[in-house]
């Protein structure tokens, strides 16, 4: 196993899905998971890692189901953006409670609640050891929060996008339905496309590939996994050119 005495990444984007935040519950925020993530983030901040967090919102609102029932897709996406802001507020509060400097930025204006997103300000905050939380996706409907994670990663010049999920990485097929599925340690962008592996939506993935932005998929429920990745341990699945 290759390890390093120093971190292999300096600036990261952590994509937190809403589903990861809800834990075993079917809805809402599991404060145990939230507080554990804050502890792990705080540990990384102490060693100088610059962290941007992109929030999902699926634990609070699943627009796809309502769209099937007749809701306008644009309206559904706007509600979803608000859900990510709610998660962002919870994350900011938890980080501040742990004495971690954090700043919440939204892609849509929400005066009095959080700042409007500004990439130059985000980079300045990161450089000064603040955790920056990005909410409201890209600010546009029809784009996922995975796309937002890749976009923000490119804008802030992140070394990698770390996608926190509830599985150990990218498998050859669904590991829940097929226990014998193969876990890939490393893939190229081309491998993912040719094998039609479910990593991110195509827009997000194409954006990362065009800008040579590495993606690592890992299990957020594995204690210490985030730091192991930062320190160069093999964890989850790494996707590069």
Swiss-Prot record:
One of its GO terms (molecular function) is ATP binding. GO terms for cellular component: cytosol. It is an enzyme of class 2 (transferase). Its EC number is 2.7.4.22. ATP binds at residues 15-18, 58, 62, 165, 171, 174. Coiled coil: none annotated. HAMAP family: PyrH_B. Homohexamer. Gene3D superfamilies: Acetylglutamate kinase-like. Pfam families: AA_kinase. Allosterically activated by GTP. Inhibited by UTP. The keyword Protein transport does not apply. Residues 23-28 are annotated as: Involved in allosteric activation by GTP. It catalyses: UMP + ATP = UDP + ADP. This is Uridylate kinase. It is found in: Cytoplasm. The keyword ATP-binding applies. Transmembrane segments: none annotated. GO terms for biological process: 'de novo' CTP biosynthetic process; UDP biosynthetic process. It comes from Blochmanniella pennsylvanica (strain BPEN). It comes from the Bacteria. Pathway: Pyrimidine metabolism; CTP biosynthesis via de novo pathway; UDP from UMP (UMPK route): step 1/1. The lineage of its organism: Bacteria, Pseudomonadati, Pseudomonadota, Gammaproteobacteria, Enterobacterales. Belongs to the UMP kinase family. UMP binds at residues 57, 77, 138-145. Catalyzes the reversible phosphorylation of UMP to UDP. Keywords: Allosteric enzyme, ATP-binding, Cytoplasm, Kinase, Nucleotide-binding, Pyrimidine biosynthesis, Transferase.
